Amino acid sequence: MLLCLTLLFSASAVLAMPTPEGSPHHEIYKVCVPEGALESCHRMSQESDLHMTCVAARDRIECLDKIKHREADFAPVDPEDMYVAAKIPQQDFIIFKEIRTKEEPDEEFRYEAVCVIHKDLDITSIHGLQGLKSCHTGVGRNVGYKIPITKLRHMGVLGPLNNSDLTPRENELHALSHLFSEACLVGKWAPDPAQNQALKAKYPNLCALCEHPEICDYPDKYSGYDGALRCLAEHGGQVAWTKVYYVKKHFGMAIGAGEAVPTGQNPDDYAYLCPDATKKPITGKPCIWAARPWQGYMANHDLDNDIADLRAKISLADTIGETENADWLSKVLDLNNKTIPIDNQGPYSPENYLNKANYTDVIERDTGAPHRPVRFCVTSDAELEKCRVLKRAAYSRDIRPAFDCVREAGLHECLRTVRDDGADVITLDGGEVFVAQRQYNLKPIVAEQYGEHGSLYYAVAVVRKDSTYQSIEDLRGAKSCHTGYGRNAGWNVPLYTLLSKELISKNSCPYSSALSSYFSGGSCVPGAQLPENNPANQNPDSLCSICAGNLDAPNNDPAWKCSASNDESFFGYSGAFRCLASGEGQVAFVKHTTVPENTDGHNQAAWTAGLRSEDFELLCADGGRASINEYSRCHLAEVPPHMVVTSNDKTDIQLNEIRHAILAAGDLYSRRPDLFKLFGDFGGTKDLLFKNSATGLLSVENGSPLMQRYSEILEVIRACENQPTP
C-alpha cells in the first residue's frame, strides 16, 4: 500500500527540509523545469503525493547548472543535453532512469540505425556503396543523414568534408552526391530559401529517387523511416537508411511483445548491410551502425542513496499523470500516453550513456580541419557568457558551423574587430547598422523578427501617467532618457521627430547641441562622449548629465557613467526606461515592447519591483497620449529591426555558412525555447546577442524593403554632415 506523503510546495526558492534521522530518502525532490513549464509543475506538486517540488530555470541548459550546484535534484534530458552535461568541468551527473515507449519497453536504445539492401546485391566491401542508389529519411536527421555521414566518413568511404570553398552543409551534400548515383534526401537543405533552392539545383541526383524530385521536401512518399524502405522496395533504391522498428513494421514482424502483422512484404528478399560489409537476415538480430539513446532523467551523485526511491516517485507520477490526463506529465516529465519511465542498469555517467550507443561521434560530426566557426563579437561579460552557452548548446544540436565568442571593450572596438576579421558578426540596432555600413565596411545579413509586426518595431516616447506632457512640443525643457547615441529608437527617431516638426531648426548644426538645448533639463544619451561619436568634441556634457553609471555594482566606477554598455544602468531600452522609472528622467525614447517587458512582474530585476504598466503612457507624435498597448496608433516611427552584420569582404561561401548557422539557431530556439532561450533574459540581463522581443530571424539583403526604411530618417538627421559648424 502506498503511504500518503505530505505535500510540500514552494513557489519560489526551494529548500530541502532536514531528513529525519534514519530515513534513507530525501524529504522532497527538486525537479528542474524551464520557466515555461513552471505552472504545470506547480500543479503536479499540488495535485499528487509525489514528494516533489519545482525549481524554475531559464531553459534545460540552466537546469544542468542547477543540478550541478545542488539547487535542483533532477531533470528530464535528451541525449544532446547529456552531451553538454558531459563537457561541464567537475560535474558528477548520473543518468538513472529512461523514457522508453510502451511498445518497446525492453529495448536498450530508442532506435537502432541500420542499412537495408536487397539480399542479392553484389557487395563485398563497404566501398561497394559507391555508385549505388540510396534512400534516406531526410536531410539533417539522425538515422538517414547524420549516422551514415559520420560512420562512412570514419571508414574512408565518404569523401572529404572540409573543402574551405564549401559550407559545412554543402560539403556533406557534395560528398553524398559523389558517393551515390541517385538518392532521395528531402527537407530544407539550408534555412535560407534561396540557398536551399540553389543547393538542390546543384545536386539534383540527391532528389532523383523522390516522389517529387523537383520539390524534394516533405511530404514525400519516399521520405521518413518507412518512406526510405518504400524507396528501396518500389522505386529503384538499392540501399535504405532507417531504423529497426520500421524494418519490423514494414515486413510485418513482431514488435516488442506484440504479434506479427503480415504486410505482404517478404523479408527474405532483403538483408541488413553491416559496417564490415557482411549481410545479416532481416528476420535475425540486426547489425546496427549506431543507436540513439533514450531520453532520460539526470541527477547528481548526492542522490546516489535515493535513486531507488526517486525512480519509484517518477513511476508513480507517470501513473497519476496518465490517470488524470494531466498536462504536467509531458511538460514537466517529458512523458505521454505512449511512453513509460523505465529503470536502467546504471546509473551511468552521461559520457558512458552516450558511448554505449556509439552516439557521441554522431553528435560531434567533426568535418575535420580547417574549422571555421561563426565568431560573435560581444561587449560585456554577461553577453560573453550567453554566447558561450549558445556555443555549447547549438553544437550539441547539430548547428554547423559552430559558434565562438570574442570579447571587446565596446561597440566600436567590435565593429573594428569584425571589419578586420577578428570576429565574424555582431548584432546591432538599426541606427548602429548605419554606422557599421558607413564607417566600417560592414553589411547586414540577418534581421530579427517581432511576431505579428514582422521585421519592424515601433519607436515610442514614454512618460509617466501623472505627468502633464500632452505633446512632443511640451517636452521642451524636460529631462530625457535615450537608449544610446546613434541608435534608432533612442536617438535617430527623436531627433528626426524634432527636426520634422521644426522644434529644432534644420540649420542648427550640430544637431547634438540643438537636441541638448531642447531637453535643457538634462539627458542621458549613453555613448555621446565616446571619441568615435564625438570626434570634434561638439557634443555637450549635458547629454550625459543624468546618466548614473552602474547602480548595481558595489563600487560605481566614474568611468562607467554614460558608457555605451551595460556598465551604464541607463543604457539600452530597459536602461532608458529605468532612467524614467527612477525619476531621473521625464521622458524615455524606447521601443513599443520596453514598458511591458519591465513592468507587472515581467522583469525580476530589483529596480522593477512594484512598477506597473498602467502608470506609464505613450506620447503620440501628433499630440495626445495613449495607453502602452496602443503603440500601433501612437508612436514616433516604424523603424527597421536589429540586424546581424558582417564584413563586406566575406566571400559568398562564408556568407552562406554564417547565415546558415545563425538562421538554424534562430529556427530551433524560437520553436524550442525550453532547450535554450535565445530570445529572452539571461542571468537577469535583457537584450544579449538578440533582443528579448525578437521571435525569430530571417535573411536580409542590401536593397531589401527592410533597408529602405532607413532612408527618410537618415536623410533628415544627416543634413548637418555637409554643412560647416557655426
Swiss-Prot record:
Which residues does Fe(3+) 2 bind?
Answer: 429, 457, 573, 642
Q: Which species does this protein come from?
A: Blaberus discoidalis (Tropical cockroach)
What is the name of this protein? Transferrin
Gene3D superfamilies cross-referenced by the UniProt entry: Periplasmic binding protein-like II
Family per similarity comment: Belongs to the transferrin family.
- Disulphide linkage map: 32-63, 41-54, 135-231, 184-210, 207-216, 274-287, 377-414, 387-405, 481-562
| Binding positions for hydrogencarbonate 1 per the UniProt entry | 137, 141, 143-144
What's a GO cellular component annotated to this UniProt protein?
A: extracellular space
**GO terms under biological process:** iron ion transport
The residues that hold Fe(3+) 1 are: 78, 111, 225
* One GO MF term attached to the UniProt entry: metal ion binding
Compartments, as annotated in UniProt = Secreted
